[in-house]
Every structure is written in C-alpha cells, then in structure tokens.
C-alpha cells in the first residue's frame, strides 16, 4: 500500500469499488474463528467452546466467569458478545473493542488477566464477520456493532454510563471514538490509536478527504469524557505521531502513556502499561 502514489490512492479510493470496500480490505484481517457459541434448548443460554488456537491460559473455574450471548445490530447482523466478571465488587466495566486480527476466543485470557489486575469487569464483542458474528467487517458495521454492544451492556446488565470505560485498541479505537463522541461515559482509553486511514498510509496527509476512512481525528474533540491515550514510541503499524495528534485534540486529556521502545502489538507487555491503568482507574477517576 505504501508503494502507491498519492494520486493513485485517490483514484483507488474514489473509483469503484466504493471506498468502504477498499477500507475493509485494508483494515480488517479476521482470523479463522477460535471459538464457537452453542445455544441450549431454551435459546437463552450460550456455552463458550474454545479451540486450541485460542490459547486459553486459565482453569475451567475462570472460564465459568465468562458469559456469552448474541445480539442483533441496527444493520441486521448478529454479533457475539462476552461479559467477563473479573471482580464482583468492580465499580467500572471496560467496553473493550479489540484489534483487527483477533477474535473473542483469542482475547478471552487477556481479558481475565487485565480485569483481575485493574479491578474491572470487561465487556467485549466481535465485529461483524469476526468469530461467531455474522455479516462482513466494514466501517459502517463497526459503528453499528459498538452501538449494539453499548445497548446490550446497559440493558442486559443495568450498567450506567458513568460506570463504563470505553476502551479501544488499534482499529478498535475507531468505533470507540465514534461512540464516545456521542455518549458520555466514565472515561475513554485509546490504545495505539489511529487518526485516520489516509494518515496511516500517507503520514504527510494534513486534512481529511471525503474518501478517507476511520476519521478519529475529526471526532475526538467531541468527546467530553476524560481520555487516556496509550501508544508505543516505536509503533511500526500506526506511527506514534497519531497518538500525539489525538492527544492534542482532546477536550479532557489525562496524562498519556508513551511507552518507550514499544511497538504496535507489545505495549501491554511493558510494566508501565498495567501501572498506568491501575493508577487511572483506582485514583484518577475518583477525582475527575
């Protein structure tokens, strides 16, 4: 993609097939599903079955803390949802939108570990076309998917917006920013975020074109909740400059976490990642 000239990319985006289809091919890499959801005879209870590729790292006891179900989006797709009760006394629940090359099965162990360490429950979902979710991944479906997840989290579990932390990682920052720009929540965490699709492909892009996809840079200033941005300084996929640019546009930014030497897929392996999240959840949110 980076070998294309600016004019060639403009032609690619502006001519058939439509920009949304181009964006989908470039941004979404759904893996072969690493789990299945089996519904019981009543049609109300779903059982999670993980494949070996999910790399489950805990016992069956921890797995029992995971509740899964399906919900329908405004665009007609059925998406898989996962609620991980890490901490019964948790004040906050993370609405977690994952990266572009994983599904809920692969993320389930990470959710257990993260939630138990920062004292939060975690609600996540698979994008259309990922895991057990129907349909195909697209920018429009991303927004419909997170809307359906937001509604399910609030209605099924009775969790109020002021107790929800909207968390997006990589491509997951796109639906997260869109949702947070429309609804207030306890806070927003953006992990390795992008400013827009064009700016990822062409770092010198200074404005948002009509054919651009995923325009976080134009939406982030509408977020009224506190925003924590986390980015690796050596990110080889989404340059560190994207995190900086978004930080500068925030209405209510908190102290960001720039992880020295971290790339795109290893930020969470650095000790300061968990320390910053613990501080943010346990101390800073209380005073914001």
UniProtKB/Swiss-Prot annotation:
It is found in: Cell membrane; Recycling endosome membrane; Cell projection, Dendritic spine; Postsynaptic density membrane. InterPro entries: AB_hydrolase_fold (IPR029058), Hydrolase_4 (IPR022742). One of its GO terms (cellular component) is plasma membrane. Its main location: membrane. GO terms for molecular function: palmitoyl-(protein) hydrolase activity. It catalyses: S-hexadecanoyl-L-cysteinyl-[protein] + H2O = L-cysteinyl-[protein] + hexadecanoate + H(+). The gene is abhd17b. Pfam families: Hydrolase_4 (PF12146). This is Alpha/beta hydrolase domain-containing protein 17B. Keywords: Cell membrane, Cell projection, Endosome, Hydrolase, Lipoprotein, Membrane, Palmitate, Postsynaptic cell membrane, Synapse. Palmitoylated on cysteine residues located in a cysteine cluster at the N-terminus which promotes membrane localization. GO terms for biological process: regulation of postsynapse organization. The active site is at residues 170, 235, 264. Hydrolyzes fatty acids from S-acylated cysteine residues in proteins. Has depalmitoylating activity towards nras. Its EC number is 3.1.2.22. It comes from the Eukaryota. It is a lipid-anchor.
């Amino acid at each position: 993609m980076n070998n294309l000239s600016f004019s060639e990319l403009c032609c690619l985006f502006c001519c058939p097939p439509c920009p949304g289809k181009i964006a989908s091919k470039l941004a979404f890499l759904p893996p072969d599903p690493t789990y299945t959801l089996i519904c019981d005879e009543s049609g109300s209870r779903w059982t999670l079955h993980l494949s070996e590729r999910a790399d489950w790292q805990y016992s069956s006891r921890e797995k029992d803390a995971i509740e899964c179900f399906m919900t329908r989006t405004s665009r007609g797709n059925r998406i898989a949802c996962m609620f991980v009760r890490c901490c019964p006394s948790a004040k906050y629940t993370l609405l977690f939108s994952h990266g572009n090359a994983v599904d809920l099965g692969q993320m389930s162990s990470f959710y257990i570990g993260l939630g138990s360490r920062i004292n939060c429950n975690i609600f996540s979902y698979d994008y259309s076309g990922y895991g057990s979710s129907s349909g195909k991944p697209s920018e429009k479906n991303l927004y419909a998917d997170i809307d359906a997840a937001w509604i399910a989290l609030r209605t099924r579990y009775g969790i109020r917006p002021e107790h929800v932390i909207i968390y997006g990682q990589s491509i997951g920052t796109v639906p997260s920013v869109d949702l947070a720009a429309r609804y207030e929540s306890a806070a927003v965490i953006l992990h390795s975020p992008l400013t827009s699709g064009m700016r990822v492909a062409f770092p010198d892009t200074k404005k948002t074109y009509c054919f651009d996809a995923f325009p976080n840079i134009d939406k982030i200033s509408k977020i009224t909740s506190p925003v924590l941005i986390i980015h690796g300084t050596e990110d080889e996929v989404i340059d560190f400059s994207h995190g900086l640019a978004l930080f500068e546009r925030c209405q209510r930014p908190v102290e960001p976490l720039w992880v020295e030497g971290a790339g795109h897929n290893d930020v969470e392996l650095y000790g300061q990642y968990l320390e910053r999240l613990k501080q943010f959840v346990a101390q800073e949110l209380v005073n914001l």
